[in-house]
Structure formats: C-alpha cells, structure tokens
Amino acid sequence: MSKLIAFDQEAREGLQKGVDALADAVKVTLGPRGRNVVLDKAFGGPTVTNDGVTIARDIDLEDPFENLGAQLVKSVAIKTNDIAGDGTTTATLLAQALVNEGLRTVAAGANPIAVNRGIAKGTERVVELLRELAQPVADNAAIANVATVSSRDEKIGAMVADAFDKVGKDGVVTVEESQSIEDESIVTEGVSFDKGYLSPYFVTDQETGHAELENPLILLVREKISSLPDFLPVLEKVANSGKPLLIVAEDIEGEPLQMLVLNAIRKSLKVAAVKSPYFGDRRSAFMDDLAIVTGGTVIDSELGHKLSETTLEQLGSARRVNITKEETVLVDGAGSAEAVEERRNQIRNDIERTDSSWDKEKFEERLAKLSGGVAVIRAGGATETEVNERKLRIEDAINAARAAGQEGVIAGGGSVLVQIADEIEELSRKEEGDEGIGLRSLARALRRPAYWIADNAGLDGAVVVSKIAEQPNGSGFNAATLEYGNLLEQGIIDPVKVTHSAVVNATSVARMVLTTETAVVDKPAAPAGQAGAHAGHAHAH
C-alpha cells in the first residue's frame, strides 16, 4: 500500500491537531459540573457517558496524520485506565496541555531533546511530591468520599464503600446490570484468580474490555489442550447445549485456540479461555479447589480421564463469570456449600500441620480465595442507555476506591497539581537553557486540570487557578459548591495512584510527540467512482 509522509513541523502539526480533537471531546466531562458526551453506536442505542476512556476508545479521525495524534493520546487514557482504573480524563488533558506547551517552545527554537530532559526530570519530582503528600485511607468514610468524587454520586459512593467494607480492601467487587430501576448490592460466594483471557477476541463488552459469561459451563483441564481431535467432541456437546463456555487449563494452543477464537468471532459459541494460575503442586491444588466451587471435575489424564470422552456432567458451572485482561472472577459456583466448607476445613488442617512458613502462606492464600465472597453491585436504570452509563460510573468508583487503598489519597479538584506546579516552576529557575523550558512547560500543563474543572463549572479558570495557588496544602476549589476550603475535610479527594499514573502516562506520550520528526501513514483509498481524483481529495468519507 502507498504511504504518505510528513516531515518536521508539518508532521508535528498533524499530530497536534489529532491530540486536540480527542482531548477537546474528553475534557468537557471533567469535574463535578462536567457535561456528558453522546456516542453513536453501530448496534443498539447511543451511549451517554462522562467516562474519559470510553469516549477516547470511540474516536477515530478521518485525516490519517491527525488520527495518529488521536491514537497516541488515546493510548494515554487506556494505559491509565489499565493501571489505575480511573483518571483517564485528567491524563488526556495533561497530555494535550504538555504537547501544546512543548510544541510551542520547540517552534520558538528550543531544543526538543533538552526540553524532553526537563519534562522527565520534572515528572520524577511530581511523583515524589505526590507520594510525600499522600494521606492513608483511614476509614470507610474516606473510601466513600473517593468513590463519590469519581462517580459524582453519593449513593454510588456509599454502595462501593459498603461493598469493600464487607469483602475487605483486597476483596473482589464487581458490577453487573440490574433487572430493576434501582441499584442494589449483594455479597455472594465467589472465587477470583490472577489470570486473564487468552485472546482479546473473547471480549464481550468492548467498552469495558471484559469478557462476561452468564450461567456458563466450566471445563477444567489439568494439562495443555493442543489436540483438536481430542478437543472437538466436548466443544460440540457444549455448542449443542446452547450455553456459554469457560475453559481453564494449563494452556490452550494451536488449533484448539484457533477454533475457539473462530467461534467467538462468528458468535456461534460464547466462549472464553484462561490459563490456570500458579505452578506445580499449587496449580494442581487450586484446580481441585475450582472443581469443588463449580461442581465440576478436573480432566486429568493421570487419573484416566480422556478429554475426547468428557461429558457435560463433568463440567462445572457458575451464575456468572467476569474476565479482564489480568483477572478472572467466578460468581456463585454450582458446587455444594457442604463440599466447599469441607475443602476449607481440609486447608485449615494443612495450615496447622505445616512447619514451612512459605507453605503456610500459600495455604492461607487458598483459604482466603475460598472464603472471601464477591460483592456484586447491580446498576439500575429506566433504559438500557441509563443502565450502561451508570455501570461505567460504578466501575470508575470501584477502581478509584481500590487505588486509594493502595497508595493513599490527596486533596482533589486538581488543587495539588496546581501547588506542585509552583514548585516545578521554582525548580526551572535553577536549570539553565532548554531543560528549564521543559520544566516550565510541565508546570503550565499541571495547572490545566484545575483550569478546566473551573471552566466546566462556568467560572474563569485562570482566576480560580491563581487562587488555588494561594491556598495551603490540602485546600483548594470545590467545584460542586463553588467555594474554596479544606478539600480533605470536605471529602474532595483523589487517589494518589490515579493522579501519578495520569501524570506519568501523559508526559510519556507528550515527550514522544515533541521528538517526532517524521510521520508515515497509509494513503487513504479513493472513494468509489473517484479513483482518478486528486490525492488531496482521497480521504475516505
């Protein structure tokens, strides 16, 4: 395929326009008075959301050079979401601000490599300061505040805090759609483990990137699955049953994996496959745990089982399975409560008998997985659009609450970044040349989230930012009440993990854009009937 190439300023301008287009669509959602964005969908009704990463994922631009810029800043939102689960709008906005500030200085003659060094140096200092300012999450009220700020809904905040209170800060909290108008929360039996889907083709919800299976059959296999003739009979039996299928095995490779992916793409069978966690004896023991929880049998050739002769009766099941890129959660396995309790007692006996502290720790981990319930929050609403929008907000709240428990919290509303910006500005005065310019560019970018939170609230962002800079640490601007005060006391708080992930990911992409000299894209195909048209009109419409 023919390529289009842009150099120097032309390449950077194309990228900048794409960055601006995507970031401008996302930043209207920032803050408690931010607006919604409506996304048109090829199937079903439109999606109404204020979730930054959902909006970013939906945007592709017609101009190929501008689209490169949009995809770069989209990666900031997606990576921040993957690491912290929230803060995607802040990350997108920071990337835009830093790209614009940096390109302005480069156009004025600054050395982009030196500017980059300054930005990198400043980013390290920002992360240090964020961690120094972090306050530990002391109680359930703090979790509720974090979840409320993330979702903009006190009821969601309270439900999320209550869910974590019931299952513990390391417990599993998941979200699903409710059959009623009201939200509801339950704690149910469940097991989670740190393995995600083997192929992204198994994803059923493109917005969240999750594979969700309702009432699936569960095939547990001790060894690798690599022979299609052995695998096909059980796959056909499941297909005839009309139920979804989850496969947990040491690995699935070659033709069997290709067959599963093909079925998923054609939607002829709703299926997902994950590797079994751990190694050796631990893997084997955990597979036995799963068999008891799901009411299934582990297919094991050493015990005389043949995969090709597996019956539906040997498969386990669960009410629901949710799989992300990194984790699998089984809710309400079909195994009997008596069998599960018997297994727990067996593990408790193993803990008492062992002299090895390492073995004891691993037994306790297994016991925790079998004992810890899964909190399920069900998103309610009058319409499918409302339910989906609420589901996204609950997911953000859950992720923010979990992040807060990991690295602590800081005052929210972008206020801490404004105050840190002043310190970075001070640092820039000690640096000579273009590294100092890079530090100043970073300082200006750090003030933009607070600026846009104020702007979305109908106020002059520049005036609000200057007033925030005068506030003591922990204080700032509350866009919900339009007042200045102690944000920590008012419960306007952000998780440190979310803010620091946003800063690190935004600066990483901005630095790439600043040092770009050439952009290469596929030449757009001419629309039908215009094959001989001028290349300038060859963009796809």
From Swiss-Prot:
Assigned keywords, A-Z: ATP-binding, Chaperone, Cytoplasm, Isomerase, Nucleotide-binding
The EC number(s) this enzyme carries: 5.6.1.7
Binding residues for ATP: T29, L30, G31, P32, D86, G87, T88, T89, T90, G413, N478, A479, A480, D494
Catalytic activity: ATP + H2O + a folded polypeptide = ADP + phosphate + an unfolded polypeptide
Pfam family, one: Cpn60_TCP1
GO molecular function: ATP binding; ATP-dependent protein folding chaperone; isomerase activity; unfolded protein binding
GO BP term, example: protein refolding
Subcellular location: Cytoplasm
Keyword Oxidoreductase set for record: no
Cellular-component GO terms for this entry: cytoplasm
InterPro entries per the UniProt record, alphabetical: Chaperonin_Cpn60_CS (IPR018370), Cpn60/GroEL (IPR001844), Cpn60/GroEL/TCP-1 (IPR002423), GroEL-like_apical_dom_sf (IPR027409), GROEL-like_equatorial_sf (IPR027413), TCP-1-like_intermed_sf (IPR027410)
Keyword Nucleotide-binding: yes
Family in the record: Belongs to the chaperonin (HSP60) family.
Quaternary structure annotation from Swiss-Prot or TrEMBL: Forms a cylinder of 14 subunits composed of two heptameric rings stacked back-to-back. Interacts with the co-chaperonin GroES.
Annotated function: Together with its co-chaperonin GroES, plays an essential role in assisting protein folding. The GroEL-GroES system forms a nano-cage that allows encapsulation of the non-native substrate proteins and provides a physical environment optimized to promote and accelerate protein folding.
Name the record gives this protein: Chaperonin GroEL 2
Organism: Corynebacterium jeikeium (strain K411)
Gene from which the chain derives: groEL2
